[in-house]
């Protein structure tokens, strides 16, 4: 949940900054081919920068502390559990971190399967049984083993490319109609101020709308991560963990930022912008074995 939201926000910010730099420096492509190349470079560039920054951003955002050497029995159990599951999943031992938060949560991130991070909240360790916590950790290990962050990066790169390309095509048309006069030497994109304003606004708007695609993919991969956890530690443990989440403390952020929602209580249109499917749907998918085949 958290890794996807941070990735999308960082990615959108990088993409907009690139667009601002291009417009302010007057680097505006005058041909469709040139614009497409620029969109590809900056679309995928923003995604990969977000991916490379993901571990640092995630740790900074929650104040997480990487465990170098276990200092108590709880940290020792956590390290041993992650090591065992990583070995079962065929990946290198991830870095392990703990962050202070009352809510039950965990996330995994990293640019590569063999250079990843798993972080859990103190709320998870305090409020979940060992079996439930084991299932949540296995869920995050499955995300790493499945390469979900890299796949998300590629999907986001394609989405970014279309957002930049379409936004700037429309901006060129708008600048030409509303203020551009190419005969007076204002450039092939028409009025530069209008071009700059329209392109920036459209990139923001289309970027938010395009997040529907990436959120759908995130929800789809959550089902597979649940199935991966069931294969690693057992279906009943994962179901028990999800049932625990239904009755857990609800973070304040979940009421104002749907990208961070994990409780699955939201309905209707807002589900399009959720990173996770509703918990009841995830439990039903595990019971039916739909993603375990």
Swiss-Prot record:
What GO biological process term is on the record, naming one?
A: proteolysis
Predominant place of localization: membrane
Topological category with respect to the lipid bilayer: Multi-pass membrane protein
- Documented EC number(s): 3.4.24.-
> Cellular location of this protein?
Cell inner membrane
Q: Name one GO molecular function term.
A: metalloendopeptidase activity
Gene Ontology CC annotation, any one: plasma membrane
Instruction: Name the keywords, alphabetized.
Output: Cell inner membrane, Cell membrane, Hydrolase, Membrane, Metal-binding, Metalloprotease, Protease, Transmembrane, Transmembrane helix, Zinc
**Does Zinc appear among the keywords?**
yes
Q: How is the cofactor bound?
A: Binds 1 zinc ion per subunit.
Tell me which residues this entry annotates as catalytic. Answer: 140
- What is any Pfam family matched here? Peptidase_M48
**Parts of the chain on the Periplasmic side:** 25-33, 179-192
The answer, when asked if Metal-binding is one of the entry's keywords, is yes
Taxonomically, which superkingdom? Bacteria
Cytoplasmic topological domain? 1-3, 55-157, 214-293
The record lists Zn(2+) as bound by 139, 143, 222
Which cofactors is this protein said to need?
A: Zn(2+)
User: Where do the TM regions start and end?
Assistant: 4-24, 34-54, 158-178, 193-213
Which InterPro entries does the record cross-reference, listed alphabetically? HtpX_protease, Pept_M48_protease_HtpX, Peptidase_M48
| Similarity-based family | Belongs to the peptidase M48B family.
Specify the protein name. Protease HtpX
The organism that produces this protein has a lineage beginning with:
Bacteria, Pseudomonadati, Pseudomonadota, Gammaproteobacteria, Enterobacterales
């Amino acid at each position: 949940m958290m890794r996807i939201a941070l990735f999308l926000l960082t990615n959108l910010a990088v993409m907009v900054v690139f667009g601002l730099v291009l417009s302010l420096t007057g680097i505006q492509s005058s041909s469709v081919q040139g614009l497409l190349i620029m969109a590809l470079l900056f679309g995928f560039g923003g995604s990969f920068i977000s991916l490379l920054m993901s571990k640092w951003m995630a740790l900074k955002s929650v104040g997480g502390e990487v465990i170098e050497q276990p200092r108590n029995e709880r940290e020792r159990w956590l390290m041993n559990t992650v090591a065992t599951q990583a070995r079962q999943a065929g990946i290198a031992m991830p870095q392990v971190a703990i962050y202070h938060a009352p809510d039950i949560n965990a996330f995994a991130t990293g640019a590569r399967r063999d250079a990843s991070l798993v972080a859990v909240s103190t709320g998870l360790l305090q409020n979940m049984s060992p079996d439930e916590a084991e299932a949540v950790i296995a869920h995050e290990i499955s995300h790493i083993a499945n390469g979900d962050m890299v796949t998300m990066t590629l999907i986001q790169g394609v989405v970014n490319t279309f957002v930049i390309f379409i936004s700037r095509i429309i901006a060129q048309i708008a600048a030409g109609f509303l203020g551009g006069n190419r005969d007076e030497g204002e450039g092939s994109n028409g009025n530069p101020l209008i071009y700059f304003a329209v392109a920036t606004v459209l990139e923001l708007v289309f970027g938010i709308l395009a997040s529907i695609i990436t959120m759908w993919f995130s929800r789809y991969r959550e089902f597979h991560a649940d199935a991966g956890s069931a294969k690693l530690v057992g279906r009943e443990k994962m179901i028990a963990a999800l049932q625990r989440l239904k009755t857990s403390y609800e973070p304040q952020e979940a009421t104002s930022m749907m990208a961070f929602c994990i409780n699955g209580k939201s309905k209707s249109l807002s589900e399009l912008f959720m990173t996770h499917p509703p918990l009841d749907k995830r439990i039903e998918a595990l019971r039916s074995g739909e993603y375990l085949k």
